């Protein structure tokens, strides 16, 4: 899995969060779509949510899942203005955790037990 974030701010916590989750087994296409994933590009399920950011540019959080293998391809925080990874501060991290928690509640993701 690729993780896209600028290496400052809360980047380490964001990476730890990404590494602590995985897809639940046997998720149907319908479940992905009900949880907010799209597949306009047929081989990929794509989850994207805008984040409220103090910068004047829009920032998004996204997860890409390969439809055939049901594996997470990438997770990232993207500056939509420049289409580049963005840094994660406390506010963004809280919003990302909220989105991840909702996907856990939907049964799409689960936390890896250590």
Go through the PLM ranges and name each one.
Residues 1, 31-32:
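N-terminal low-hydrophobic presequence detector
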Residues 2-9, 13-20, 25-27, 51-53, ...:
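Intrinsically disordered, low-complexity regulatory regions enriched in serine/threonine/proline
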Residues 26, 33-69:
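Ser/Thr-rich, low-complexity intrinsically disordered terminal regions
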């Amino acid at each position: 899995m690729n993780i896209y974030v600028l290496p400052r701010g809360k980047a380490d916590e964001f990476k730890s969060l990404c590494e602590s989750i995985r897809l639940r087994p046997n998720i149907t296409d319908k479940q992905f779509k009900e949880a907010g994933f799209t597949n306009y590009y047929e081989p990929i399920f794509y989850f994207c949510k805008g984040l409220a950011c103090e910068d004047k540019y829009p920032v998004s959080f996204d997860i890409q899942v390969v439809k055939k293998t049901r594996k997470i391809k990438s997770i990232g925080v993207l500056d939509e203005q420049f289409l580049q990874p963005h840094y994660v501060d406390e506010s963004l991290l809280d919003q990302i955790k909220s989105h991840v928690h909702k996907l856990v509640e939907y049964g799409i993701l689960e936390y890896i037990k250590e």
